UniProtKB/Swiss-Prot annotation:
Part of the 50S ribosomal subunit. This is Large ribosomal subunit protein uL4. One of its GO terms (cellular component) is cytosolic large ribosomal subunit. The gene is rpl4. It holds the Pfam family Ribosomal_L4.
Length: 252
Protein backbone atom coordinates (compact mmCIF):
# COMPACT_ATOMS: atom_id res chain seq x y z
CA UNK A 1 0.00 0.00 0.00
CA UNK A 2 1.43 3.35 -1.10
CA UNK A 3 0.79 6.89 0.11
CA UNK A 4 1.75 10.43 -0.86
CA UNK A 5 4.13 12.49 1.28
CA UNK A 6 3.48 16.24 1.45
CA UNK A 7 5.87 19.06 2.27
CA UNK A 8 4.97 21.99 4.51
CA UNK A 9 3.46 23.84 1.54
CA UNK A 10 0.93 21.07 0.95
CA UNK A 11 2.68 19.87 -2.22
CA UNK A 12 3.10 16.17 -2.98
CA UNK A 13 6.83 15.43 -3.08
CA UNK A 14 7.04 11.63 -3.26
CA UNK A 15 5.31 8.30 -2.76
CA UNK A 16 6.28 5.79 -0.08
CA UNK A 17 5.25 2.29 0.95
CA UNK A 18 3.16 2.26 4.10
CA UNK A 19 3.88 -0.14 6.97
CA UNK A 20 1.89 -3.38 6.81
CA UNK A 21 -0.17 -2.28 9.82
CA UNK A 22 -2.22 -0.03 7.49
CA UNK A 23 -3.62 -3.14 5.78
CA UNK A 24 -5.05 -4.54 9.02
CA UNK A 25 -8.70 -5.68 9.02
CA UNK A 26 -11.23 -3.21 10.47
CA UNK A 27 -12.54 -4.66 13.76
CA UNK A 28 -14.91 -2.21 15.50
CA UNK A 29 -15.76 -4.83 18.14
CA UNK A 30 -12.14 -5.15 19.28
CA UNK A 31 -11.61 -1.40 19.09
CA UNK A 32 -14.58 -0.80 21.41
CA UNK A 33 -13.35 -3.43 23.90
CA UNK A 34 -9.82 -2.04 23.93
CA UNK A 35 -11.08 1.52 24.38
CA UNK A 36 -13.27 0.56 27.35
CA UNK A 37 -10.30 -1.21 28.92
CA UNK A 38 -8.01 1.81 28.46
CA UNK A 39 -10.70 4.23 29.65
CA UNK A 40 -11.66 2.29 32.79
CA UNK A 41 -7.98 1.85 33.69
CA UNK A 42 -7.88 5.62 34.27
CA UNK A 43 -10.78 5.63 36.73
CA UNK A 44 -9.95 6.22 40.37
CA UNK A 45 -11.61 3.89 42.91
CA UNK A 46 -13.79 5.74 45.39
CA UNK A 47 -15.57 4.82 48.59
CA UNK A 48 -17.20 6.37 51.62
CA UNK A 49 -15.78 6.66 55.13
CA UNK A 50 -16.56 3.34 56.90
CA UNK A 51 -17.85 5.31 59.91
CA UNK A 52 -19.93 7.81 57.90
CA UNK A 53 -23.34 8.17 59.58
CA UNK A 54 -22.30 5.93 62.48
CA UNK A 55 -20.71 8.55 64.73
CA UNK A 56 -23.67 8.89 67.06
CA UNK A 57 -24.76 7.85 70.55
CA UNK A 58 -28.10 6.55 69.24
CA UNK A 59 -29.22 3.15 70.52
CA UNK A 60 -32.13 0.79 70.06
CA UNK A 61 -34.45 0.59 73.08
CA UNK A 62 -36.23 -2.49 71.70
CA UNK A 63 -39.89 -3.38 71.28
CA UNK A 64 -42.89 -2.64 73.46
CA UNK A 65 -42.87 1.16 73.25
CA UNK A 66 -45.41 1.67 70.47
CA UNK A 67 -43.00 3.13 67.98
CA UNK A 68 -40.58 2.00 65.29
CA UNK A 69 -37.60 0.04 66.55
CA UNK A 70 -34.94 2.31 65.05
CA UNK A 71 -31.85 3.67 66.76
CA UNK A 72 -32.64 6.95 68.48
CA UNK A 73 -30.62 9.62 70.25
CA UNK A 74 -31.76 10.80 73.73
CA UNK A 75 -33.65 13.72 72.16
CA UNK A 76 -35.92 11.22 70.41
CA UNK A 77 -35.09 11.43 66.73
CA UNK A 78 -33.77 8.56 64.64
CA UNK A 79 -30.12 8.23 63.68
CA UNK A 80 -27.68 5.77 62.12
CA UNK A 81 -30.28 3.95 59.97
CA UNK A 82 -30.36 4.68 56.20
CA UNK A 83 -33.85 6.22 56.24
CA UNK A 84 -32.90 8.78 58.92
CA UNK A 85 -31.56 12.26 58.31
CA UNK A 86 -27.79 12.06 58.83
CA UNK A 87 -27.85 8.25 58.81
CA UNK A 88 -25.49 5.99 56.92
CA UNK A 89 -26.04 5.08 53.27
CA UNK A 90 -27.49 1.64 52.64
CA UNK A 91 -25.11 0.65 49.83
CA UNK A 92 -22.33 3.24 49.51
CA UNK A 93 -19.64 3.01 46.79
CA UNK A 94 -16.75 0.76 47.78
CA UNK A 95 -13.10 0.95 46.81
CA UNK A 96 -13.07 -2.82 46.36
CA UNK A 97 -15.30 -2.54 43.28
CA UNK A 98 -13.44 -3.66 40.14
CA UNK A 99 -13.63 -0.80 37.64
CA UNK A 100 -10.97 -1.88 35.13
CA UNK A 101 -12.31 -3.98 32.28
CA UNK A 102 -9.41 -6.18 31.29
CA UNK A 103 -8.68 -7.14 27.69
CA UNK A 104 -6.30 -9.76 26.33
CA UNK A 105 -2.90 -8.45 25.24
CA UNK A 106 -3.19 -9.80 21.68
CA UNK A 107 -6.68 -8.33 21.37
CA UNK A 108 -5.43 -4.92 22.50
CA UNK A 109 -2.56 -4.95 19.99
CA UNK A 110 -4.87 -6.05 17.18
CA UNK A 111 -7.34 -3.30 18.12
CA UNK A 112 -4.60 -0.64 17.94
CA UNK A 113 -3.49 -1.95 14.55
CA UNK A 114 -7.08 -1.93 13.30
CA UNK A 115 -7.58 1.66 14.53
CA UNK A 116 -4.37 2.73 12.76
CA UNK A 117 -5.63 1.19 9.51
CA UNK A 118 -8.96 3.02 9.97
CA UNK A 119 -7.15 6.38 9.74
CA UNK A 120 -6.49 5.56 6.06
CA UNK A 121 -10.17 4.94 5.26
CA UNK A 122 -11.89 8.17 4.06
CA UNK A 123 -15.39 6.73 4.63
CA UNK A 124 -14.70 5.90 8.29
CA UNK A 125 -13.09 9.31 8.87
CA UNK A 126 -16.12 11.10 7.37
CA UNK A 127 -18.53 8.95 9.38
CA UNK A 128 -16.76 10.15 12.51
CA UNK A 129 -17.71 13.72 11.60
CA UNK A 130 -14.34 15.10 10.50
CA UNK A 131 -14.25 17.85 7.85
CA UNK A 132 -11.47 17.72 5.24
CA UNK A 133 -10.94 18.43 1.55
CA UNK A 134 -8.33 15.85 0.58
CA UNK A 135 -9.17 12.27 -0.36
CA UNK A 136 -5.56 11.06 0.00
CA UNK A 137 -5.52 9.34 3.36
CA UNK A 138 -3.49 8.78 5.44
CA UNK A 139 -2.00 12.29 5.47
CA UNK A 140 1.79 12.08 5.70
CA UNK A 141 4.09 15.11 5.97
CA UNK A 142 7.84 15.46 5.91
CA UNK A 143 9.71 15.14 9.20
CA UNK A 144 10.53 18.87 9.02
CA UNK A 145 7.01 19.38 10.41
CA UNK A 146 8.40 18.35 13.81
CA UNK A 147 10.64 21.44 13.88
CA UNK A 148 7.74 23.93 13.81
CA UNK A 149 7.67 26.07 16.95
CA UNK A 150 4.62 28.30 16.42
CA UNK A 151 0.97 27.32 16.59
CA UNK A 152 0.17 29.65 13.68
CA UNK A 153 2.75 27.79 11.55
CA UNK A 154 1.12 24.44 12.34
CA UNK A 155 -2.31 25.84 11.45
CA UNK A 156 -0.90 27.21 8.19
CA UNK A 157 0.29 23.70 7.27
CA UNK A 158 -3.16 22.32 8.09
CA UNK A 159 -4.69 24.94 5.76
CA UNK A 160 -2.40 23.90 2.92
CA UNK A 161 -3.23 20.24 3.52
CA UNK A 162 -6.97 21.00 3.39
CA UNK A 163 -7.78 19.93 6.95
CA UNK A 164 -7.94 23.25 8.82
CA UNK A 165 -11.76 23.27 8.66
CA UNK A 166 -11.79 20.40 11.14
CA UNK A 167 -10.00 22.56 13.73
CA UNK A 168 -12.62 25.28 13.19
CA UNK A 169 -15.38 22.65 13.57
CA UNK A 170 -13.90 21.65 16.94
CA UNK A 171 -13.58 25.27 18.05
CA UNK A 172 -17.22 26.01 17.20
CA UNK A 173 -18.34 22.82 18.91
CA UNK A 174 -17.06 23.67 22.40
CA UNK A 175 -20.09 23.64 24.71
CA UNK A 176 -20.70 24.06 28.44
CA UNK A 177 -21.35 20.66 29.97
CA UNK A 178 -24.74 19.84 31.46
CA UNK A 179 -24.80 18.70 35.08
CA UNK A 180 -22.46 18.83 38.05
CA UNK A 181 -19.35 18.14 35.98
CA UNK A 182 -19.16 21.93 35.58
CA UNK A 183 -18.17 22.13 39.25
CA UNK A 184 -15.64 19.33 39.00
CA UNK A 185 -13.00 20.69 36.68
CA UNK A 186 -14.64 19.69 33.38
CA UNK A 187 -16.82 22.68 32.54
CA UNK A 188 -16.53 22.39 28.75
CA UNK A 189 -17.21 19.55 26.33
CA UNK A 190 -14.64 19.75 23.53
CA UNK A 191 -14.92 17.84 20.23
CA UNK A 192 -11.89 15.82 19.10
CA UNK A 193 -10.21 17.12 15.96
CA UNK A 194 -6.91 16.18 14.30
CA UNK A 195 -4.45 13.71 15.79
CA UNK A 196 -0.79 14.47 15.02
CA UNK A 197 1.63 11.56 15.37
CA UNK A 198 5.34 12.43 15.53
CA UNK A 199 8.45 10.27 15.74
CA UNK A 200 9.85 11.59 19.02
CA UNK A 201 9.53 14.49 21.44
CA UNK A 202 9.88 17.71 19.46
CA UNK A 203 8.86 21.38 19.21
CA UNK A 204 5.75 20.53 17.20
CA UNK A 205 4.17 18.90 20.26
CA UNK A 206 3.94 22.25 22.06
CA UNK A 207 3.08 24.11 18.86
CA UNK A 208 0.18 21.81 17.90
CA UNK A 209 -1.57 21.10 21.16
CA UNK A 210 -2.89 24.67 21.56
CA UNK A 211 -5.25 24.20 18.61
CA UNK A 212 -8.83 23.28 19.63
CA UNK A 213 -9.41 19.54 19.63
CA UNK A 214 -5.92 18.70 18.36
CA UNK A 215 -3.92 16.00 20.15
CA UNK A 216 -0.22 15.25 19.62
CA UNK A 217 1.46 11.97 20.53
CA UNK A 218 4.66 10.11 19.72
CA UNK A 219 4.45 6.87 17.75
CA UNK A 220 5.84 5.01 20.75
CA UNK A 221 3.01 6.18 23.06
CA UNK A 222 0.21 5.95 20.48
CA UNK A 223 -2.78 4.10 21.94
CA UNK A 224 -6.43 3.32 21.34
CA UNK A 225 -7.47 6.34 23.45
CA UNK A 226 -5.90 8.65 20.83
CA UNK A 227 -6.91 6.73 17.71
CA UNK A 228 -10.53 6.01 18.65
CA UNK A 229 -11.96 8.52 21.15
CA UNK A 230 -15.22 7.16 22.52
CA UNK A 231 -14.40 3.78 21.01
CA UNK A 232 -15.12 5.01 17.46
CA UNK A 233 -12.24 4.56 15.01
CA UNK A 234 -11.46 6.73 11.98
CA UNK A 235 -9.84 9.79 13.51
CA UNK A 236 -8.37 12.33 11.09
CA UNK A 237 -4.64 11.81 11.59
CA UNK A 238 -1.47 13.51 10.36
CA UNK A 239 1.63 11.31 10.36
CA UNK A 240 5.23 12.43 9.99
CA UNK A 241 7.70 10.28 8.06
CA UNK A 242 9.72 9.58 11.19
CA UNK A 243 6.52 8.49 12.97
CA UNK A 244 5.91 5.86 10.28
CA UNK A 245 9.44 4.54 10.75
CA UNK A 246 8.85 4.23 14.51
CA UNK A 247 5.50 2.59 13.81
CA UNK A 248 7.16 -0.01 11.61
CA UNK A 249 9.68 -0.78 14.37
CA UNK A 250 6.90 -1.09 16.95
CA UNK A 251 4.55 -3.42 15.08
CA UNK A 252 6.85 -5.30 12.73
Amino acid sequence: MKAVVYNLNGEAVKEIDLPAVFEEEYRPDLIKRAFLSAFTARLQPKGSDPLAGLRTSAKNIGKGHGRARVDRVPQGWAARVPQAVGGRRAHPPKVEKILWERVNKKERIKAIKSAIAATANPELVKERGHVFETENLPIIVESSFEELQKTKDVFAVFEKLGISDDVIRAKNGIKIRAGKGKMRGRKYKKPRSILVVVGDKCNAILASRNLPGVDVITAKDLGIIHLAPGGVAGRLTVWTESALEKLKERFE
